[in-house]
């Protein structure tokens, strides 16, 4: 049995805070290290090699500082590119988040699915799932969610985002003759717009994300491997650049219980 459980949560932005808050409800006694690659944010408009190098280098760097029992890559884009490599590299479990294609295919009634994600995640889905003959009957409508990701960060920092602004970004999907009855939220940031999406899309639209899968995996992997102690009040954030963006999100990080803020010196 372990006296202290160490969990690493990685994201380019603050979208991973959603998973942190959810996982902490079930595993409140762990020491959480949230790693924020704010210098590389957003990943959606970056090249694959750039993302792969940053994700792997940063996570390896963190594993040299701490002995993690679980590493969570709470970013669809990063998971699509680097998760397979990281799983082979570390002995301790590494889990990530990817669009739940199977569930969306199983529940769609009109065989039209919408995917909101970064271009890299969209390409991952197209190359790994929609080249199978069994999915030929499915029509996939995709939308680059980069602007929605930026807006979600503004919302998390307390800014009011008007519904029409979100609706305008979603027009390429909403203006289709047949609107998808199932929408995949292929980015952690989009979970913060769940209620706005419910208002914008037709009644009955199903929204699919991978939070339950990620939570279940986390609980299954570590729930029996440590001694429960008192809940740790203050957690730690590591960031990659002390820029204006980071200063803006500091109050939010503090609100989530991250008192200790430390810079990663892997990049100059």
Curated annotation (Swiss-Prot):
Family under the similarity heading: Belongs to the aspartate/glutamate racemases family.
GO MF entries: glutamate racemase activity
UniProt KW keywords: Cell shape, Cell wall biogenesis/degradation, Isomerase, Peptidoglycan synthesis
HAMAP family noted in UniProt: Glu_racemase (MF_00258)
Protein name, UniProt field: Glutamate racemase
Active-site residues, Swiss-Prot/TrEMBL: 75, 187
Its biological purpose: Provides the (R)-glutamate required for cell wall biosynthesis.
Domain of life: Bacteria
GO biological process per UniProt: cell wall organization; peptidoglycan biosynthetic process; regulation of cell shape
Enzyme Commission number(s) from the entry: 5.1.1.3
Annotated residues for binding of substrate: 11-12, 43-44, 76-77, 188-189
Keyword Isomerase: yes
InterPro entries, per database record: Asp/Glu_race, Asp/Glu_racemase_AS_1, Glu_race
Reactions that this protein is recorded to catalyse: L-glutamate = D-glutamate
PROSITE patterns: ASP_GLU_RACEMASE_1 (PS00923)
Pathway entry: Cell wall biogenesis; peptidoglycan biosynthesis
NCBIfam families per record: glut_race (TIGR00067)
Species per Swiss-Prot/TrEMBL record: Wigglesworthia glossinidia brevipalpis
């Amino acid at each position: 049995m372990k006296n202290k459980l160490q969990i690493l949560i990685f994201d380019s932005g603050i979208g991973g805070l959603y998973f942190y808050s959810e996982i902490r409800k079930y595993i409140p006694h762990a020491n959480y290290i949230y790693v924020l690659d704010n210098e590389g944010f957003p990943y959606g408009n970056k090249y694959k090699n750039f993302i792969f190098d940053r994700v792997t280098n940063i996570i390896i760097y963190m594993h040299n500082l701490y002995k993690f029992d679980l590493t969570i890559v709470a970013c669809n884009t990063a998971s699509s590119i680097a998760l397979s490599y990281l799983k082979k590299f570390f002995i301790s479990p590494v889990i990530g988040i990817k669009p739940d294609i199977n569930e969306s295919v199983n529940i769609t009634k009109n065989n039209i699915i919408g995917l909101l994600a970064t271009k890299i995640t969209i390409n991952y889905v197209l190359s790994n799932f929609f080249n199978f003959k069994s999915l030929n009957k499915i029509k996939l409508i995709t939308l680059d969610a980069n602007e929605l990701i930026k807006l979600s960060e503004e919302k998390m920092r307390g800014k009011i985002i008007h519904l029409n602004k979100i609706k305008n970004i979603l027009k390429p999907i909403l203006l289709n003759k047949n609107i998808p009855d199932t929408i995949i939220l292929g980015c952690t940031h989009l979970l913060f717009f769940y209620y706005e999406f419910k208002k914008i899309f037709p009644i009955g639209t199903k929204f699919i994300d991978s939070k339950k899968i990620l939570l279940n995996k986390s609980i299954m992997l570590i729930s029996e491997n440590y001694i429960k102690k008192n809940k740790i009040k203050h957690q730690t954030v590591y960031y990659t650049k002390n820029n204006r963006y980071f200063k803006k999100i500091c109050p939010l990080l503090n609100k989530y219980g991250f008192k200790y803020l430390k810079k990663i010196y892997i990049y100059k």
